[in-house]
């Protein structure tokens, strides 16, 4: 039924017309309607299936305590508790009864060597040992002193014929000898010079004058005429028979000493003599003259800064001039004038350029020691006074500290044997000590039997002259002999005349530094230096000032597309549009994007256990494993059966040397041995008794010239000659090698302040050095102030369509639907996460035993196993046959001392022994108080000025000093000091405060200025001990002017430690 309502009279908007009649067929389905509102809750559904059991819940909170139960039965005793800590020691119990002696213990290991015992008494002289083998020839000994005059030796054999000597001086006429038998007539000689007429002979019987007949027989010898002049010597006649020995003539008068011979050439340097015994200390020598100034030492390291001095008065500021050119070195100044009153210290000026070192001034004389008190101005030096009389000797000082050990004296005589002490307890044998020093030579053994004659010895030294023989026949003149050995010292000669002035002497040793010279004139401008090396990276600079704003940059490339902007605010709802006509059916839309992966499913049940697989193929042999640890010793195995008797073994190696057996009985005398080699030449026997006087032998021919004799001992020192004229000064010697660094001298007195140098000209600018490396990037600067806002940019282009938005949040869960029918099986899901490991399955059956693999390489040998327990002794084997005799073993070592027996009962007291020898001198007593100072010595004459030393290198400017600074030396400047052990890299320094710093050594000057020198410590190495030695770094201390009764000097060395 339709109804119609007329709304024409309504004044509202037009309403839709009435619905038309139903069309002939149903229309196509319309679009889905909007989701309806939520319906009311349905009735509860059927019970679902039981869920799987949930995880166990957390433990509940602890319940309230229940009421106390009734008392239980007594429990069983508990196990023993752990051992408690040791209690305090109880009181000492009474001594127990002595136990029985225990069994002797095993022999102990040798203990460490004990300290050396005191030296025992010398033993009795042993019996003479058998003669040792001939030793090698020793080195030639030192020349011995002259021996006693020997007996006259027998005449020597005739020497070789010497060359014809020069004609000798005419000899004194000898006594006429007895007439010899007539010789056979010689050939006629050349006619001699006419002799002076002889005495008239007896008149002969007048003969008949006839022709000259042959020479008649020789007539009787006439009386000898007077001596003619000496003819030239004839050739030597045959040797006559020896005449009877004449009586010795009386000793001639000692001749006057001959003139002094020319000085011989310097002999070859002798072998160094053995060290003589230490002589007694000589008397103290006179003080030496002061030496020349030493070369400058190298610059010392920077000293520790001194305490800050009081500020000085402000000096006037000078204008900084340019550096002046160097002045020539000034001439040495004359005597130092009196020092002015010291002004207050000005502030340190800027360091000037180093001037050349001035020549050392002439050395002033040391002033006499003034009384203590404030230092007055030194007065001018007075002239030297005359030498005063020698003062009376001072009191003897107390005994000084013990001197160094002297050389060991000769062994004293053997004292009498003292009474035997009680036996000591047995010590364990010590390990073998080091080889002892060679023992003293024993006393001379009994002489052996005479050996066969030795080979001929070398030619002996020339013997001393025998007693004067009777004059022999005149021999031919020999050649001039070599100079004989030097004679004994002659008597002390008279002082010689004054010598001529000496030549230039060698330059003397460098002396002590002179006083500080006056400041030199400024030095010349130096040459331009080379460009310096590249400097190290500088420290980052401070932040620079803010830079000016830069120019506007070009526009950059367009940026990447920005993310989709957030949605705008919801616009105002528009008016509802008219309902459109139904559209055509749209095409099926594309499938939606895949959803996000769901969470992983729960772990699946573990799968059933698979069957055992087939045995795999045999693997390769593995690499040898490392050696296993040493296994524990296995249990002792049972004794094996006794083996059969072995074959006779070969002779074993010689066994270790056994302990020496007891001495055997004396054997029968052996058969005579073969003659030994000739023994060495025996010592010279004692002088025999003097033989009967022999007959005078014939004069031998002159012997060969003897070797030059050894120089005789030097004669006594002659009295000094008169002083020679002073030689002119020598040229300066070449510069010597740089000496080892000298010790730091005591600081000199402060010199007067020098005048300021003229300002030097400014140097040329140096070359530009290479640019340094780029420095490390500095730290970022502070952020600048915010910039001005920029102009607004142009509007951007329309963005492309954004990506799909993230899925919205899950809606609230709908009500539970009915259980659907089972769906088709889905595709297999992704593999689940691995399940929890299943329980361990039962062990599989043992596989077949694999084939033996190839033997692996031998592993490294494991450490030796623990020594197993000794097996039971085997059955005793049959006795072997006797082996062949081995070589005679070496003499066995001395057996160990047997174990100490129990102490015997005390013997009766012996008689009191004789008094022992006086003990060694006691230690030197403490030093006595210093004696009164001696008078001042005379002033020495002024020495000649030394040659100027080479200018030393300019040192680095030192730190401003207050008083004196004691600057430590750099450890390694030139060659290493051989006496410096490991360098003192680390000395332990005691703690100190800023006000009173710790000092390793405190030295004070004579003006009460402390010289401080503290080592810094980089590491305390006292915990390690390297065994190397070191010395304290105190090189030399020369305390001066200590000796008044209230003065003392000492150095206290605290704990030090060397690495």
UniProtKB/Swiss-Prot annotation:
It comes from the Eukaryota. Residues 1-997 are annotated as: Disordered. Residues 143-162, 294-306, 469-478, 499-508, 532-541, 622-631, 646-655 have a biased composition (Gly residues). Residues 85-104, 116-128, 179-251, 283-293, 307-339, 383-444, 479-498, 572-581, 594-621, 656-675, 695-722, 836-845, 861-875, 914-933 have a biased composition (Low complexity). It is found in: Secreted, Extracellular space, Extracellular matrix. Keywords: Collagen, Extracellular matrix, Secreted. Residues 1026-1059 form the Fibrillar collagen NC1 domain. GO terms for cellular component: collagen trimer; extracellular matrix; extracellular space. One of its GO terms (molecular function) is extracellular matrix structural constituent. Its main location: secreted. The keyword Secreted applies. The keyword Secreted applies. Disulfide bonds: none annotated. Residues 13-27, 130-142, 945-960 have a biased composition (Pro residues). SMART domains: COLFI (SM00038). Residues 47-61, 876-889 have a biased composition (Basic and acidic residues). Belongs to the fibrillar collagen family. This is Collagen, type I, alpha 1b.
């Amino acid at each position: 039924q339709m109804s119609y309502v007329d709304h024409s009279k309504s004044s509202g908007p037009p309403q839709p017309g009435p619905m038309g009649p139903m069309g002939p067929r149903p229309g196509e389905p319309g679009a889905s309607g909007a989701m309806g509102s939520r319906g009311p809750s349905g009735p509860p559904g059927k019970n679902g299936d039981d869920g799987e059991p949930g995880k166990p819940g957390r433990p509940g909170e602890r319940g309230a305590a229940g009421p106390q139960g009734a008392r239980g039965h007594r429990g069983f005793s508990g196990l023993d508790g752990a051992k408690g800590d040791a209690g305090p020691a109880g009181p000492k119990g009474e001594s127990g009864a002595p136990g029985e002696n225990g069994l002797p213990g095993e022999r102990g290991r040798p203990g460490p060597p004990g300290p050396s015992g005191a030296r025992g008494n010398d033993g009795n002289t042993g019996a003479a040992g058998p003669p040792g083998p001939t030793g090698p020839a020793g080195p030639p000994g030192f020349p011995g002193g002259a021996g006693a005059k020997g007996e006259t030796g027998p005449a020597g054999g005739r020497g070789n014929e010497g060359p014809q000597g020069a004609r000798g001086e005419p000899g004194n006429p000898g006594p006429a000898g007895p007439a010899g038998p007539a010789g056979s007539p010689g050939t006629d000689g050349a006619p001699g010079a006419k002799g002076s007429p002889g005495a008239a002979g007896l008149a002969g019987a007048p003969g008949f004058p006839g022709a000259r007949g042959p020479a008649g027989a020789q007539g009787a010898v006439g009386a000898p005429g007077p001596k003619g002049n000496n003819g030239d010597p004839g050739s030597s006649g045959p040797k006559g028979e020896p005449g009877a020995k004449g009586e010795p003539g009386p000793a001639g008068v000692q001749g006057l000493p001959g003139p002094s011979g020319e000085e011989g050439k310097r002999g070859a340097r002798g072998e160094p003599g053995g060290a003589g015994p230490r002589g007694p200390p000589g008397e103290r020598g006179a003080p030496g003259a002061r030496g020349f100034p030493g070369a400058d030492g190298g610059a010392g390291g920077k000293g520790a800064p001194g305490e800050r001095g009081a500020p000085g008065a402000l000096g006037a500021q000078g204008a900084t001039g340019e550096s002046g050119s160097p002045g020539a070195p000034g001439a040495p100044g004359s005597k130092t004038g009196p020092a002015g009153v010291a002004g207050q210290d000005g502030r340190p000026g800027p360091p000037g350029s180093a001037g050349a070192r001035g020549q050392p001034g002439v050395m002033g004389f040391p002033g006499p020691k003034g009384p203590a008190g404030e230092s007055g101005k030194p007065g001018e030096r007075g002239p030297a006074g005359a030498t005063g009389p020698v003062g009376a000797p001072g009191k003897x000082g107390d005994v000084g500290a013990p001197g160094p050990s002297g050389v060991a004296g000769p062994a004293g005589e053997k004292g009498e044997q003292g009474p035997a002490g009680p036996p000591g307890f047995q010590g364990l044998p010590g390990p073998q000590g080091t080889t002892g020093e060679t023992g003293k030579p024993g006393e001379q053994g009994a002489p052996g039997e005479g050996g066969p004659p030795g080979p001929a010895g070398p030619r002996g030294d020339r013997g001393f002259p025998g007693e004067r023989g009777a004059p022999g026949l005149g021999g031919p003149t020999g050649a001039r002999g070599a100079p004989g050995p030097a004679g004994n010292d002659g008597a002390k000669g008279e002082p010689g005349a004054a010598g001529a002035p000496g030549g230039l002497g060698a330059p003397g040793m460098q002396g002590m530094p002179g006083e500080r010279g006056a400041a030199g004139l400024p030095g010349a401008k130096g040459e331009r230096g080379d460009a310096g090396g590249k400097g190290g990276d500088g420290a980052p600079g401070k932040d620079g000032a803010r830079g000016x704003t830069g120019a506007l940059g070009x526009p950059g490339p367009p940026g990447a597309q920005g993310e989709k902007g957030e949605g705008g605010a919801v616009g105002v709802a528009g008016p509802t549009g008219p309902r459109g006509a139904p559209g055509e059916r749209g095409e099926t839309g594309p499938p939606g994007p895949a959803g996000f992966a769901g969470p992983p499913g729960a772990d699946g049940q573990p799968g059933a256990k698979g069957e055992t697989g087939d045995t795999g193929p045999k693997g390769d042999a593995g690499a040898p494993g490392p050696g296993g640890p040493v296994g524990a010793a296995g249990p002792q195995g049972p004794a094996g059966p006794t083996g059969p008797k072995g074959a006779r073994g070969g002779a074993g190696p010689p066994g270790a040397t056994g302990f020496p057996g007891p001495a055997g009985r004396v054997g029968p005398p052996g058969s005579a041995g073969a003659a030994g080699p000739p023994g060495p030449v025996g010592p010279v026997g004692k002088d025999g008794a003097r033989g009967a006087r022999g007959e005078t032998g014939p004069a031998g021919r002159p012997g060969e010239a003897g070797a030059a004799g050894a120089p005789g001992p030097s004669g006594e020192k002659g009295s000094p000659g008169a002083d020679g004229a002073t030689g002119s000064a020598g040229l300066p010697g070449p510069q010597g090698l740089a000496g080892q660094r000298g010790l730091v001298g005591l600081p000199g007195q402060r010199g007067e302040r020098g005048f300021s140098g003229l300002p030097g000209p400014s140097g040329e600018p140096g070359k530009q050095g290479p640019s340094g490396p780029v420095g490390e990037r500095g730290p970022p600067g502070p952020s600048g102030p915010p910039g001005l806002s920029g102009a607004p940019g142009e509007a951007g282009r329309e963005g492309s369509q954004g990506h799909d938005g993230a899925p919205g949040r899950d809606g609230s869960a709908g009500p539970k639907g009915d259980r659907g029918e089972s769906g088709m099986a889905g595709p297999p899901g992704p593999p689940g996460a691995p399940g929890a490991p299943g329980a361990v399955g039962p062990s599989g059956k043992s596989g077949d035993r694999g084939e033996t693999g190839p033997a692996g390489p031998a592993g490294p040998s494991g450490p030796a196993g623990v020594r197993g327990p000794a097996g039971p002794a085997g059955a005793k084997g049959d006795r072997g046959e006797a082996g062949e005799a081995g070589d005679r073993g070496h003499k066995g070592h001395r057996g160990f001392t047997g174990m100490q027996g129990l102490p015997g009962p005390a013997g009766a007291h012996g008689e009191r022994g004789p008094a022992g020898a006086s003990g060694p001198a006691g230690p030197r007593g403490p030093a006595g108080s210093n004696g009164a100072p001696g008078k001042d010595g005379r002033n020495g004459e002024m020495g000649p000025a030394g040659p100027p030393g080479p200018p030393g290198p300019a040192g680095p400017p030192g730190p401003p000093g207050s008083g004196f600074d004691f600057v430590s030396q750099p450890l390694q400047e030139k060659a290493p000091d051989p006496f410096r052990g490991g360098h003192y890299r680390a000395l332990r320094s005691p703690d100190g405060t800023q006000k009173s710093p710790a000092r390793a050594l405190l030295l004070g000057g004579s003006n009460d200025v402390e010289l401080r020198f503290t080592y810094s410590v980089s590491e305390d190495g006292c915990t390690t001990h390297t065994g190397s030695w070191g010395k304290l770094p105190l090189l030399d201390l020369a305390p001066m002017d200590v000796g008044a009764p209230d003065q003392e000097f000492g150095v206290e060395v605290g704990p030090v430690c060397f690495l």
